[in-house]
Amino acid sequence: MYSPYDFAIDPDMSKNYFTQAHRNELEWNFNLLKKKFIDKGYYVVITEMGATDKCNTEQRIAWGTFYVQRTRQLKMACVVWDNNSWNTNWDANEKFGLFHRDKGTFEPDSYVNALINAAKY
């Protein structure tokens, strides 16, 4: 679930700040999933989530930490998307690369660590 759209997947580089309105939208989506599935005894796995790289690592950390912690609190699991595509020229169109398969390293390491730490809560 790439939400909110303008922060998470819209390639517009100017939409690079994670706002309270974005938090509210995520909260609404998560609560809808909880009401429709969790409260009825079904498991929820969000099989794709991520925020395209707009050269805004700190904002992606804030988004990812909120996203993962909140889904964990609601008893949901999520899977981060990595498409091996990197932002190298200020083009944020589908730049979800996290793991350099050729080097065996993560980038940005701080974002990946934030997602992992948020899952531990």
Predicted regions and their residues:
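Aromatic-rich peripheral "rim/lid" segments of glycoside hydrolase catalytic domains that contact
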Residues: 56-121
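Extracellular glycoside hydrolase catalytic/binding regions
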Residues: 1-73
